[in-house]
C-alpha cells in the first residue's frame, strides 16, 4: 500500500463510533480503484463481542450512500479472504496504531505458508467431484 487511500471524515467517524470495532478495512474493487458506480462496498473487520455487525451495516450504508455492502468478520474468514484483504485492503480505522500492519503481516505470512497445501487439498476435492 504505497499511497494512503482518502476516506471521508464521515466514514472514519462511523468506524470510530462503532462500539467494539478494532479494525476496519476496505477491500475489493473500491480498494483496488477499479470499481464502477454500481460496485458494492467490501469491508472487513476485527472486533470484540461488543460490536454489532447488523447495526454497523446500517450506519455504514448511510455514510457511503449505498446498501450494497459486504461485511466480513476477519476472525472467522478463511485464509484466502484474509490474504486478499491484507494484499488489496486499506485501513479505514484501527483502534490502536499498527493494528492493520500486524493483521496484514499475519495474514500474508499464513497464506504464504499454507497456500500450496490448501491448493493441493482443493485440487483433490475437485478431482473427486469431477465425473
Task: Kindly give the residue locations of the regions a language model identified.
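Catalytic core of pol beta-like nucleotidyltransferases
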Residues: 1-23, 31-37, 47-131
Amino acid at each position: 500500500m504505497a499511497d494512503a487511500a482518502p476516506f471521508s471524515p464521515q466514514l472514519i467517524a462511523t468506524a470510530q463510533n462503532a462500539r467494539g470495532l478494532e479494525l476496519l478495512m476496505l477491500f475489493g474493487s473500491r480498494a483496488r480503484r477499479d470499481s464502477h458506480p454500481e460496485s458494492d462496498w467490501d469491508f472487513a473487520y476485527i472486533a470484540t463481542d461488543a460490536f454489532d455487525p447488523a447495526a454497523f451495516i446500517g450506519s455504514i450504508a448511510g455514510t457511503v450512500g449505498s446498501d450494497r455492502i459486504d461485511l466480513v468478520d476477519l476472525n472467522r474468514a478463511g485464509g484466502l479472504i484474509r490474504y486478499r484483504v491484507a494484499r488489496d485492503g486499506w485501513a479505514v480505522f484501527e483502534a490502536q496504531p499498527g493494528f492493520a500492519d500486524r493483521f496484514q503481516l499475519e495474514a500474508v505470512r499464513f497464506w504464504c505458508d499454507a497456500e500450496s497445501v490448501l491448493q493441493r487439498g482443493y485440487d483433490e476435492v475437485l478431482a473427486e467431484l469431477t465425473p
